[in-house]
Amino acid sequence: MKDPSEKDRLRQEAEALLQQWEGRYHAYGLFELFDAHSDGDDIVVSGGKRIPCLRQQQGNSPYLCLSDFLRPLNLSPVSSFQTSDSSTIGIFSTSVSLALETDFDADPYQKMMAQLLADRLAEAAAERMHEQVRKDYWGYAKDEHLSIPEMLVEKFQGIRPAVGYPSLPDTSLNFIIDDLIDIKQIGIRLTESGAMKPHASVSGLMLAHPQARYFSIGKIGEDQLLDYARRRGLPLELCRRFLAANL
């Protein structure tokens, strides 16, 4: 938005709405920490539940997969991708009051503003929860002291890849996350493809490896699609539908 006055006006409107919503609508968060290890391109959490991941096939090496940032089972930390921080994983989800999606239906502009703010609130809840996990619950960054601008440019250790985003593009992985932490506890319901309702919801993983970074899977080949369908235990054509944007 190039016009500073328009930007300021929208900010003022958003802040006024947030003040009106105080006590009426809420953001919710849920997380759990699990012992975990990698098995090829799968993340295996305690109890044996697997989270199949995808690996980059385009561009230059290294061809990354999120499982790279967890230690293989029974392997000591000897490589650059294996440290004492790489045997635990966080699984999380955040959402907002479902009423935010319906209370403003009569006013298209207010509905648009409500949806934009609801999305930001769900993301902000995830950011705040991730900070608390790093510093207190997981505790691998007890001495972290970052300003909000520093947090927004991710100067902290670890990553928080979300389902449906470039490094974890398959939204149907939400079914696995639901099995692990029961996201229904915070009011989230899943569609048949794994999309979340309310729309302003976020789910994903927390990885603490000091070299963990965000990346985009990009396009994958038929060979990886076949392997992924096998690891998911799902029909090939269903996985093809889930990963259409990556084929």
Residue ranges of model-derived segments:
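Conserved mixed alpha/beta catalytic, RNA-binding, or beta-rich assembly cores of soluble enzyme
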Residues: 95, 102-137, 214-215
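Compositionally biased, low-complexity/repeat regions
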Residues: 17, 26-46, 69, 131-230, ...
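Catalytic cores of large soluble enzymes that bind and process phosphate-bearing ligands
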Residues: 2-13, 109-117, 125, 165, ...
